């Protein structure tokens, strides 16, 4: 590891630092300690999540644990929910310029996803002091298998 950046913060920097291809990277989940599948590693990279370092070793997060962690954070740290115009008033920043993640899967929300929430008159949620919403995948009623497990919509 280089002296200026001893612990790469994302998957791409980790691969660059150690001269690995993404397909060759092997990580364990920081919570369940199981190996991440190739799909989990790609999802972790696409979601722009940070690598967690413990005792000098990098960890990622599997999809199941990310959803569980999101639910736990939602239950423990939900402050309030409101519509987009209120979020803009409170932050002083237009919704398109606010960095937001999906509170379920943690993917950064695209402008299209934020716009769908605004047009659909859906609420944004302040969880752990950060504004969140749901992405098109997690908010889609087509993919909901257990409506009782969905909250904050």
UniProtKB/Swiss-Prot annotation:
ZnF unnamed: positions: 29-65, 102-138
A Pfam family per the record: E6
Places the protein is found: Host cytoplasm; Host nucleus
Main subcellular location: host cell
Keywords (A to Z) from UniProt: Activator, DNA-binding, Early protein, Host cytoplasm, Host nucleus, Host-virus interaction, Inhibition of host innate immune response by virus, Metal-binding, Modulation of host cell apoptosis by virus, Transcription, Transcription regulation, Viral immunoevasion, Zinc, Zinc-finger
InterPro entries listed in its UniProt record: E6, E6_sf
Keyword DNA-binding: yes
GO annotation terms (biological process): DNA-templated transcription; regulation of DNA-templated transcription; symbiont-mediated perturbation of host apoptosis; symbiont-mediated perturbation of host ubiquitin-like protein modification; symbiont-mediated suppression of host innate immune response; symbiont-mediated suppression of host type I interferon-mediated signaling pathway
GO molecular function terms listed in the Swiss-Prot or TrEMBL record: DNA binding; zinc ion binding
Domain of life: Viruses
Keyword Transcription regulation in annotation: yes
A GO CC annotation given for this chain: host cell nucleus
Function: Plays a major role in the induction and maintenance of cellular transformation. E6 associates with host UBE3A/E6-AP ubiquitin-protein ligase and modulates its activity. Sequesters tumor suppressor TP53 in the host cytoplasm and modulates its activity by interacting with host EP300 that results in the reduction of TP53 acetylation and activation. In turn, apoptosis induced by DNA damage is inhibited. E6 also protects host keratinocytes from apoptosis by mediating the degradation of host BAK1. May also inhibit host immune response.
More info: Belongs to the low risk human alphapapillomavirus family. The cancer-causing human papillomavirus E6 protein has a unique carboxy terminal PDZ domain containing substrate but low risk E6s do not possess this domain.
Self-association and partners: Forms homodimers. Interacts with ubiquitin-protein ligase UBE3A/E6-AP; this interaction stimulates UBE3A ubiquitin activity. Interacts with host TP53 and EP300; this interaction inhibits TP53 activity.
Family stated for the protein in its record: Belongs to the papillomaviridae E6 protein family.
Annotated protein name in UniProt: Protein E6
Species per Swiss-Prot/TrEMBL record: Human papillomavirus type 2a
């Amino acid at each position: 590891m280089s002296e200026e950046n001893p612990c790469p913060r994302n998957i791409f920097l980790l691969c660059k630092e150690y001269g690995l291809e993404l397909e060759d990277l092997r990580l364990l989940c920081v919570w369940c300690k199981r190996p991440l599948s190739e799909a989990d590693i790609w999802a972790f990279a696409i979601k722009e999540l940070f690598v967690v370092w413990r005792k000098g070793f990098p960890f990622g997060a599997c999809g199941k644990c990310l959803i569980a962690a999101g639910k736990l954070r939602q239950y423990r740290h939900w402050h309030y929910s409101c519509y987009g115009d209120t979020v803009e008033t409170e932050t002083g920043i237009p919704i398109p310029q606010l960095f937001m993640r999906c509170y379920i899967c943690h993917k950064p929300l695209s402008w299209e996803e934020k716009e769908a929430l605004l047009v659909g008159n859906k609420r944004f949620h302040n969880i752990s002091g950060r504004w969140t919403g749901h992405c098109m995948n997690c908010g889609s009623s087509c993919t909901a298998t257990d409506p009782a497990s969905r909250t904050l919509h």
